[in-house]
Amino acid sequence: MSYSLNSTVLKPLSNKKPENAVILCHGYGGDGKDISLLASYWRAYLQDTVFICPDAPEKCAASPTGFQWFDLMDQSQEQILSKSLVAEKKLNDLIDEVKLQNNLVANQIIIGGFSQGCMLSLQTGIKRKDKINSIIGYSGKIIDTDHLSKNINSRPKIILMHGDSDQVVTIDAFLEAKDFFAKNKYIIETKIFENCEHRIPTEGSSLGLQFIKKNLY
């Protein structure tokens, strides 16, 4: 199977037709292979799940060997939002392709990601009318709370995780997102990792796995 975004795909270890899917979006300057390491760990415990880890559609302005979902360099908030909407369309298209090619419904699909991939997953999942199952977010934030508040179309379950020492996307962004989803009556789980910078710790990987098991199995 091929998708509109170049993707690292990990097929179910059961060698059966997938019963569900997890789409993981990498961070700024990364690629699908980077975040597929997380999927490789989860895969052993989720043997009927297909994992799709796409490369973002643009070469990264700050890291020519990596990719970006949208440009963050010298951009105004309005420009960032505008460019994120283009990436959102591409991620929505990928979700539809994963549904079609694997004969799944949206409620059998979880999306998520790290940093910029988390930002895009939150925006896409909340605005999508065909409700996905859940969203897993590591070290991210809401791109534009005003835009998102005016475009809520579904309420997937959410887990947000963040390091308290993150200097790239600060803990304030996590707290803002937590407050936004609480005010808008989302079912949300959160976890702050102590002495953790901008990364996914082992505990975060384990919590993500538990979240998927609970919601897809």
Regions inferred by a protein language model and the residue ranges of each:
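A conserved short beta-strand
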Residues: D130-I142
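C-terminal catalytic histidine-bearing segment of alpha/beta-hydrolase fold enzymes
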Residues: L175-Y217
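Gly/Ala-rich beta-loop-alpha elbow adjacent to hydrolase catalytic centers
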Residues: G113-G117, S121
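Short alpha-helix in the alpha/beta-hydrolase fold that links the catalytic acid
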Residues: S36-S40, T170-F180
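Serine-hydrolase catalytic machinery in alpha/beta-hydrolase-like enzymes
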Residues: S2-L104
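Short beta-strand/loop motif that positions the catalytic acidic residue
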Residues: I159-H162, D166
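Active-site signature of alpha/beta-hydrolase-fold catalytic machinery across serine-
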Residues: L37, Q123-K127
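Alpha/beta-hydrolase fold nucleophile elbow
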Residues: N103-G113
